Amino acid sequence: MEFKEDQLVKWLKLTKVPKLGPSKILKLFNLESDIERIFSLSDEQLLQTRLFNEQMILDFSQLKRASDDNFIRAIKECKENNIQVLTILSDAYPSYLKNIPYPPLTLFLKGNLELLYKNKVAVVGSRNADENAKNWTYNLSKKLVENNLVIVSGGAVGIDYAAHRGALDAKGNTICVLGSGFFRMFPEKHIELFKEIERQGLLISEHLPNFPGSTIALVQRNRITSGISNGLVMVASGEKGGAMIQTKMAFEQRIPIFYPKEELNLQPNEGVIQIKKDWAGIEIESVEDIIKKLIIRPEIRTES
């Protein structure tokens, strides 16, 4: 299902209703397949769907009455800046992403959408990783793209940067999942990196272009990073932090989790020890160790 611009405004409003998450919205569209029809339902009809309670109906009513201006402006900005909008109802939305816990309802994308259908490996780790860990990550990413795999990471300093840089320098493809909108990307010193990824890969956000980012958004984007990937490599991390939250999400999504040999002593390594002990991680010595354990999804297009 594809939306016209006025329908997309309604969709964006609908997704802002508190407690009306992906599962309920998908059920709602199974009952009422037209966004215009949903917006015309009476309070009683909304209650009869058993997807809304009285407070949600009040919230929805307020959103319907609210000005459309911010959403209209955001959609215009997307068109003017080559930002593509993909909803969970779109035929182009990857089916495997729908199956993760709490899938993103709307994706904003810049770059090569075809990479959504390629085999991908998420490479993550600490912002404070040592030089050995960053060098190992860089070389791993180069080897992975040489084997027709796409590198997925989050654009942060440390391991993320090394992962993207290795893929780009090897003339491969990489995807960056952002925790902000496209007009507010950070860290600022990576703006040129983000531009390069747009040209040679794909930028993904679930937020309107002017969203400034937040701690919660950075955590939430992790489910997309692992959700679009066939496996995840956790290079170096302490016991806590974003990389460990990301790895836990990958574990819950049941994708393979890989880690470097402990003997390499890539720092910090407390997280690697925990993965080995608690999360059935797979120790790797070579790229081949990753490739043979990846989950290959049916809709992923393989190289001929």
Regions found by a protein language model. Name each.
Residues 1-135, 142:
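Short, positively charged patches
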Residues 2-5, 88-304:
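Glycine-biased, small-residue-rich flexible motifs in mid-sequence functional cores and linkers
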